[in-house]
Amino acid sequence: MPLFDYFRAPDADAVRQALDAGGGATPVGAVFDGIEAKGVDPSVVLAMMVAAVRQVPWSADLVDDRLVWPVGVEQDPEYDGPWVSELNTSARDVLAGAGDLPRVAREWARIEELGGNVDVADAQVFVESVVDLARRAREADEPLFCWISL
């Protein structure tokens, strides 16, 4: 299962420097404030959390991301990771402004992509950690990033 770590950082340049210095290893914990999120990809599973917060159906544009590291691999079909993407600030701000986290966790725990049977208490702990990270990022005026490894 692919690994996804979400973190906040001052900007994409700081992320590139940290990943270059660390050989591509996750910067979560060692360099940047973040959380581990095995199996929670930005464009589908995290976007479904954003949809639950907004109380709207999932759509592909709820979480936009752009590759920031490594530079130049967008067209390389042989490259198999890791990667880092920067998430759009609107997704960060929706998550940072989330209320009624028990409702969000109940809805999100039932999504098909998580198997539809995640324990709601576990889902709530994870939702709270994502929301807290988004709030810290917004407070610091920093973007959210996602480190991805296959």
Which role does the model predict for each range below?
Residues 1-132, 136-140, 149-150:
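Acidic (Asp/Glu-rich) sequence patches and key acidic residues
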